[in-house]
């Protein structure tokens, strides 16, 4: 995976079982105009910010890692997501950060600002990398902040090209360890539409 830079944030918590705790990925937009991946990562590097993400991806695909995969970044806030659909792992609103990778995409978040192909391809590459490094990550648990947040977050906006993202996740230059069958049914339908 191409990580252009590492700029570590002090805003993280331990995962009890390291990368084995990771079950999903939460996608965010920065909701900032004209901010680069570097400026967002610099913000995360500030201890008083109290927030972070594992990765920040600029519009040009420039990727910065801010938190190690074995640590929990502070990206989801008050959130809930039942990763195994069994009422246990992640159903507790405090556990979502423990069980997810956070990826911030530099974007205004106004529903009009496009997500360039270079950025979406880089995001797919990051997710494939996480899939290789985190043995319990399930691609069906790649979701956005709106799906897990309990306080009305709206990222990602409807103009995010989810079908392209999932297409590039399952059609990389080298296939990932787990592919199409592991995707959620809605993503499989979108990928099928692209194939036609």
Regions from the PLM with identified roles:
Residues 194-196:
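Predominantly recognizes leucine-rich repeat
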């Amino acid at each position: 995976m191409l990580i252009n830079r590492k700029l570590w944030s002090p805003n993280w918590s331990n995962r009890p079982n390291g990368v084995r705790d990771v079950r999903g990925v939460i996608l965010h937009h920065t909701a900032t105009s004209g901010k680069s991946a570097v400026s967002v990562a610099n913000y995360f590097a500030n201890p008083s910010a109290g927030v972070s993400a594992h990765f920040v991806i600029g519009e040009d695909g420039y990727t910065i890692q801010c938190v190690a995969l074995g640590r929990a970044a502070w990206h989801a806030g008050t959130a809930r997501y039942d990763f195994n659909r069994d009422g246990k792992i992640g159903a507790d609103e405090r556990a979502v950060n423990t069980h997810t990778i956070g990826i911030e995409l530099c974007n205004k978040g106004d529903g009009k600002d496009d997500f360039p192909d270079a950025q979406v391809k880089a995001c797919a590459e990051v997710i494939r990398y996480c899939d290789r490094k985190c043995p319990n990550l399930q691609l069906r648990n790649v979701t956005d902040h709106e799906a897990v947040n309990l306080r009305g977050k709206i990222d990602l906006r409807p103009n995010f090209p989810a079908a392209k993202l999932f297409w590039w996740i399952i059609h990389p230059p080298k296939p990932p360890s787990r592919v199409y069958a592991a995707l959620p049914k809605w993503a499989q339908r979108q990928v099928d539409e692209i194939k036609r």
